[in-house]
Amino acid sequence: MIEIKNVSYSYENAVTDGALKNVSLCIPQGQMVLLCGESGSGKTTFGRLVNGLIPCYYEGKLTGSIMVNGNDTTQLQLHELAGTVGSVFQNPKSQFYTLLTDTEIIFACENTGMEKREILRRFTETVQDFRLERLLGKNVSQLSGGEKQKIACASVSMLRPPILVLDEPTSNLDISAIRELREIVAKWKATGKTVLIAEHRLWWLRGLADRVVVFQEGSIVEDVPADEFWRRTPDELHAEGLRGSCRFAPQVKEHRADAQYIISPFRSSDGEFTLNIPELKIPKGAVVAVLGNNGAGKSTFARCLCGLVRKCKAQIIDGEKRYAGRKLSSLAYMVFQDVNHQLFSESVSEDVTLGLRLSEDEKRSTAEEMLWRMELWGCREAHPMALSCGQKQRLAIAGALAAQKDIIFYDEPTSGLDYRNMERVAENIRRLSEMGKTQFVITHDPELVEKCCDRFLFFENGKITNSGSWTAEAVNQLRGYFESSSE
């Protein structure tokens, strides 16, 4: 059982006054609880109370009582909680310690001093339960996002913890990977485990969650049975800043036929994966959804066209101008999927204009404009790493807007974002399109595609198998691809 009583917590050097404010919640053994709410509302912080990362890892001011299976977590070390609470983070790479899948799965058991015979027994059982046979012996860095998430779940399961905490586990997963994760979570529930899932994508937990807890500005504003929660319409969920189902009816937009970029045919290979791209003609000002399952070649395509893959001979033609190699970076800008890799400054305000050749006055005015637009002005003096995942995403996008490149690539720009922030991203993408900027949006988010994308590229196994504008046939095909998000 989990008993949280009158808990308030604020992070050291926090952006807001308090991450949690007088929160109380009792969760019986075997219950599956969905924690939802807008970015920065306190969902992730609540999970950190349960798994002991607060106060063992995150410093701050904590008051109240936190009891997990009869133990006061504030009096325990993390290793003492490891057998009771298992955690799966938004980015599974952050919890990997070894190079190979096999050693990663057994790593936690080895660290507890478990007997070899018992480790092997559990390993065999876990591989069968999670259907991991084809992933054994592989380098974890070469796995897709969904495969990494499966290995993380398997590794956590090896210690057989009665409680599991998942922090936005689907934010970087495609539809097929989400289906597999749902199967894993269903197995945990069937064995009587207590499961807490902090999530923005809600649809995949329909029929699994027993209870829904809604956070707002650090407080619990709703605690309802799941059946009651699912009776709400998409519009009612959106009004609370929550994600709903998507009918997937993207808007058709016409572009001038004489104003376009030509992407010359190119090929890129790393020895194991090959990307083959035909000639593409992209209207200027278009917003192109780049779709397909994890590992299909979408991110490689974007990196090649931004000049980030050294051996790739990608080329973009703009009238009489040709951009190739390093020159591509003068035309194209990329917002990475893991935004931590592109946040370098000591303050949010400085990060927006980092690397731009502007005067100090121009930097200040540009940063102010972009931070107001992305509703980050109140965080301007904070360190970027002190922001929530959703706020970091918006900061990286603010940097893309400030750079004023003619072509912008977004790699999962709404990963970790709630409905309102997703709408804000879509609005800014549409605004840039009206300014003539051409944008490519790598995404698994049908709501984002519906709100801002007017063309698409669909990738399978390193090839573009479908592309163009939103014809009735294309919409029907991709509605089928996204159909799981409407279930």
Regions found by a protein language model. Give the residues of each.
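ABC ATPase NBD Q-loop/coupling interface
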Residues: 65-80, 315-328
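Conserved ABC ATPase signature
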Residues: 139-143, 147, 383-387, 391
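Catalytic Walker B motif of ABC-type/P-loop ATPase nucleotide-binding domains
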Residues: 164-167, 408-411
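Conserved ABC ATPase "signature" region
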Residues: 117-135, 362-379
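ABC-family nucleotide-binding domains
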Residues: 174, 418
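Conserved beta-strand-loop-alpha-helix hinge in the C-terminal portion
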Residues: 219-241, 463-486
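H-loop/switch region of ABC-family ATPase nucleotide-binding domains
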Residues: 199-200, 443-444
